[in-house]
């Protein structure tokens, strides 16, 4: 259910969640009474160093700074989709395949769905933001 809901939100609320993002899961196993966690966050290049990133961003060594939101250097490899697969494999009942779990979201994507005003504004803003960052595509 969790993976189906997440995939459905990727279709219906792309400004709030997305397959290009991260995913985290806490799972309570009623049989063992234990909580398990899953980290589906993206990874940054393993060879990258803080010094290298600061140099590329023209930030002096030791200076108090933050990563610019619109910088390509702020991106990580998306981890959500792999996290969904891991969630189904590790915590699923085994009664449904990943394809069956994702089917409702696939159908929404193929057949359409009512778009909320919030989603409409978010998509419009995202389009304008991308156009500003990458004029002409």
Which residues does each predicted region cover?
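Noncatalytic scaffold domains of N-terminal-nucleophile
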Residues: 2-137
């Amino acid at each position: 259910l969790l993976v189906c809901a997440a995939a459905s939100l990727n279709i219906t609320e792309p400004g709030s969640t997305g397959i290009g993002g991260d995913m985290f899961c806490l799972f309570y196993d009623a049989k063992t009474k234990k909580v398990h966690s899953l980290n589906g966050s993206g990874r940054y290049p393993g060879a990258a160093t803080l010094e290298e990133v600061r140099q590329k961003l023209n930030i002096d060594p030791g200076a108090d700074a933050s990563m610019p939101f619109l910088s390509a250097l702020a991106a990580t490899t998306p981890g959500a989709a792999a996290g969904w697969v891991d969630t189904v494999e590790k915590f699923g009942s085994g009664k449904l395949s990943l394809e069956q779990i994702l089917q409702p979201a696939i159908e929404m994507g193929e057949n359409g769905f009512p778009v909320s005003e919030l989603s409409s504004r978010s998509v419009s803003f995202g389009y304008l933001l991308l156009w500003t960052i990458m004029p002409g595509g």
